[in-house]
Amino acid sequence: MTMIRKRLLIALSMTILLLMGCSKETVPSEPESTENDETVDAVTEVSDESENMEIAEVEEAEVAETVEPKYITIDFTGVTETHAEGDSVIPLKWNILSEEDNGIDFADEWYASENLSLPMIGTDWNSFSDENYEYLWEGEDLYIYENGTGNCLYVLHYPTDKWYVNGNNAYLKDGIFYGASVANGYAQPNTCFMFAYDLKNEKLLWRSADQSYNSMNFVVEGDVLICGYGFTAEPDYLYQINRNTGEIIDRLLLKKMPDLIVEQDGKLYVHTYSYNYVIEIE
């Protein structure tokens, strides 16, 4: 009887164990985490966005570098001496230090002997520069380029004798262009003057008196423009013009017409047809 019970208990235990084994649910394996995939996707998106931003910046820079120049024609028809409202200017003091007969030499030879030079580019006398711009005459048009970028900002057309599309006879400051219109020959009405022109608003600000300019260049000294005029059987002068108004504020009589002017160390080196002048200014 005892043996039978033992066998029954063993059989019952085995049955229970067997049933328990069959009843266990199979735990499905968890899918691999997608966290890594999401991180990779995020990095890829950031990389793509950065690349797109860089491309956009390059495209914007290219657009900025290829700005189209502004073409302006300045017409002086019917325009007489005109002055603008502006600050008055005290004339520079000047004193002739030397006056020498030059034997009718070339200006560049004298300047070279004095270790001086005009801000010319090349040897064709049609291109020159200042601290901000390069000016280039091509035919009867003046091209103004920005230093650094090389962008052509303006192309200006205005009447002046071809002989005078040489030398550094243009100046751009704060959007105002300073230039000159010259007719070669004896004095004529409405000729040989300097002018100031607002390039943004395309407006003439002032026009100096007739026969106040036929030198090949002018010098800028703060608010004073120094230039010259003269011709056969006419008085020959250096002029000081108020850059704000266009008014002549002083003049200095010379023996011959001033054609080129160089400033260095507080002195003007003025070349004329047959005389060289050194003039102190302060």
Question: Predicted segment positions?
Answer:
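Short loop/turn segments that connect beta-strands within beta-propeller blades
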Residues: 147-149, 198-201, 242-245, 281-282
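A short loop-to-beta-strand structural motif that recurs across blades of beta-propeller domains
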Residues: 141-143, 193-195, 237-239, 275-277
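C-terminal motif of bacterial Sec signal peptides marking the signal peptidase cleavage site
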Residues: 18-21
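Repeated scaffold domains used in trafficking and secretory/extracellular systems
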Residues: 80-82, 115-129, 160-173, 210-222, ...
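Blade-level signature of beta-propeller repeat domains, shared across WD40, Kelch, NHL, RCC1
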Residues: 259-282
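Bacterial lipoprotein signal-peptidase II cleavage site
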Residues: 23-30
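Aromatic (tryptophan-biased) beta-strands that constitute blades/sheets of beta-rich domains
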Residues: 65-120, 151-163, 203-210, 237, ...
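Short, solvent-exposed loop/turn segments at conserved positions within beta-propeller repeat blades
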Residues: 136-138, 185-191, 230-236
